[in-house]
C-alpha cells in the first residue's frame, strides 16, 4: 500500500453556495436514508418486523412526505378481492397478512405513464421450508427486503 505523507490539494464544495450541489446533497441524503431504513428493517427478526409493524413504518414514512401515500389492504379485504394465493399464505401465520400499496406522486407528469415497482414483503417466508437446510432458516427474514 502507498500512503502519501503530503497533502497536495484540498477541494471543498458547500451546498449552500452552489445550487446544483444543494439538490445533489438533498438527493444523496434521501437515498442514504432509504438505504438505512431498508437495512434496519431487514435486520429485524420476524417477531419484531411482522406485517402490522411493516405497514406502520410505511404509514409513518407517508406522514413525512406529502407526495407519498399509503393504503393498506387487510387480509379480510384481500380475501374479498379474490386474492386466494395471498390469503392462503397468510393463513399460515398467527399474524394477519397485509398488502402495502405505496404511491409516490412526483411533481412532473410524464408522457411515459406511471412506473410500478413491486417488492415482496413477506416478513418470514416459510414456503418450501422442508427443502431449506436448517442452518439457513434465520435468513428467511430477509425475504421482505424487496419491499423494504
Predicted regions and their residues:
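N-terminal hydrophobic/helix-forming segments and targeting peptides
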Residues: 1-123, 136
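Alpha-helical metal-binding/catalytic segments enriched in His/Glu/Asp
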Residues: 58, 115, 126, 130-148
Amino acid at each position: 500500500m502507498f500512503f502519501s505523507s503530503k497533502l497536495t490539494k484540498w477541494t471543498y464544495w458547500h451546498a449552500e453556495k452552489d445550487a446544483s450541489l444543494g439538490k445533489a446533497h438533498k438527493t444523496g441524503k434521501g437515498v442514504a436514508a432509504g438505504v438505512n431504513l431498508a437495512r434496519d428493517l431487514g435486520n429485524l427478526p420476524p417477531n419484531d418486523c411482522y406485517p402490522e409493524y411493516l405497514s406502520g413504518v410505511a404509514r409513518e414514512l407517508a406522514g413525512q412526505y406529502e407526495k407519498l401515500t399509503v393504503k393498506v389492504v387487510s387480509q379480510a379485504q384481500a380475501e374479498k378481492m379474490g386474492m386466494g394465493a395471498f390469503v392462503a399464505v397468510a393463513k399460515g401465520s398467527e399474524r394477519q397478512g397485509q398488502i402495502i400499496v405505496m404511491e409516490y406522486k412526483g411533481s412532473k407528469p410524464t408522457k411515459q405513464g406511471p412506473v410500478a415497482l413491486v417488492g415482496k414483503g413477506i416478513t418470514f417466508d416459510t414456503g418450501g421450508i422442508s427443502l431449506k437446510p436448517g442452518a439457513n432458516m434465520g435468513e428467511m427474514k430477509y425475504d421482505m427486503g424487496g419491499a423494504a
